[in-house]
């Protein structure tokens, strides 16, 4: 997802997609700020992205800047304690300039979230941590995501967009398949996936 956004914004070429997760490619499973333009920090599955976003949002407030900060996280990485510490800080410092988008597809590299470590009632937890929660039943609906991003933020509250998504949506052999979490398709699979997405 993040590489598609970077390509749409002109930071990288779409031609790079064919090199995803290949040796010496700039497009690895976890974005590398030293190799990929448009990435502010190298983060990964340990939840550092939300902590960095909280720091950026707090810094912007401290400097009096009208800056909005966005963090995109997965539900699997939301099992990390660092995420919850960052959420607690975001609410404590009333970071209404922070939006956290949670891709909630129920799958991660080792299986389903419930098999690995259940997040329980995630909406209730986000509210309890002081977030203005926007829940999207179809997080694959980009119009709904755009509307959620455009929704005004409640003063003094960070915003969480909980997007219930389907991993691999629209590609028959990838949809809801945990094995595709960090795997790049071969040339034949790539062509089939592109054809299915065009239809």
Predicted features by range, described:
Residues 1-92:
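Cofactor-binding active-site loop characterized by glycine-rich and histidine/acidic residues
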Residues 3-4, 32, 82-84, 110-114, ...:
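Short acidic, glycine/serine/threonine-rich loops at helix termini
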Residues 23-26, 73-80, 104-108, 139-142, ...:
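Acidic, glycine-rich active-site loops and adjacent beta-strand->loop/helix elements
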Residues 65-67, 114-147, 198:
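Conserved thiamine diphosphate
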Residues 67-71, 98, 155-163:
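Generic beta-sheet signal
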Residues 80, 84-92, 109-128:
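Active-site-proximal loop->helix
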Residues 80-105, 160-162:
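A short alpha/beta connector and helix-capping loop motif
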Residues 131, 139-142, 146-199:
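Glycine/aspartate-rich loop-and-adjacent alpha/beta segment that forms the canonical ThDP
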């Amino acid at each position: 997802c993040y590489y598609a956004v970077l390509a749409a914004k002109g930071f990288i070429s779409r031609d790079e997609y064919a090199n995803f997760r290949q040796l010496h490619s700039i497009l690895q499973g976890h974005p590398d700020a030293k190799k990929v333009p448009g990435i502010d920090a190298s983060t990964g599955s340990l939840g550092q992205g939300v902590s960095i976003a909280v720091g950026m949002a707090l810094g912007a407030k401290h400097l009096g800047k009208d800056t909005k900060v966005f963090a995109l996280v997965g539900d699997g990485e939301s099992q990390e304690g660092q995420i919850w510490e960052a959420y607690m800080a975001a609410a404590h410092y009333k970071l209404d300039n922070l939006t956290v988008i949670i891709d909630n597809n129920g799958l991660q590299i080792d299986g389903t979230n419930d098999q690995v470590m259940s997040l329980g009632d995630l909406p209730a937890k986000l509210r309890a941590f002081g977030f203005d929660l926007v829940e999207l039943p179809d997080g694959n609906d980009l119009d709904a995501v755009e509307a959620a991003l455009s929704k005004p933020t409640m003063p003094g509250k960070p915003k969480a967009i909980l997007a219930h998504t389907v991993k691999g949506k629209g590609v028959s052999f990838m949809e809801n398949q945990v094995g595709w979490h960090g795997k790049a398709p071969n040339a034949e699979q790539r062509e089939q996936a592109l054809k299915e997405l065009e239809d």
